[in-house]
Amino acid sequence: NCIQNGGKIMLFGNGGSAADCQHLATELTIRYKADRPTIAAIALTTDTSALTAGGNDIGFDNIFARQVEALGKPGDLAIGISTSGNSENVIRGLKQARDIGAAAAGFCGKGGGPMADVAAPYLVVPSNTTSRIQEMHITLGHMLCGALEIELGLV
């Protein structure tokens, strides 16, 4: 309902998960499998000025929460990606999403970690190997893109 109601998808994570966020936001905004109308999505991992100023001025643990506070609105969807489920900045970003009335979802691995307490739905890749978890996150993200295109009647 997020997209159908004029909302957007905000994705965030660290390291390889940040790259996954950027990849998936691009698949949604530009195209996945076919030319179609855009799906509003943004990776909160792309603005180096916001990330470095935030890390310096308000602490790295708060960088995604602050961006969600500024850019999010009720009805949006925040997707946090963490291979461990333990990334405090991702957890705080998801909490902030819930606080503003947005939905909070998560992709993780390694048993899930505390992200499970703030994200629903919450997809846990049953592996302790970071590279396998990241590969599955991209696969899950591609499945999400395809499902959205079909559900929204865009392809």
Language-model segments: residues:
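Glycine-rich phosphate-binding loops that contact phosphosugars or nucleotide phosphates
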Residues: 12, 17-154
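Glycine-rich phosphate/diphosphate-binding loops that line cofactor/substrate pockets in enzymes
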Residues: 1-9
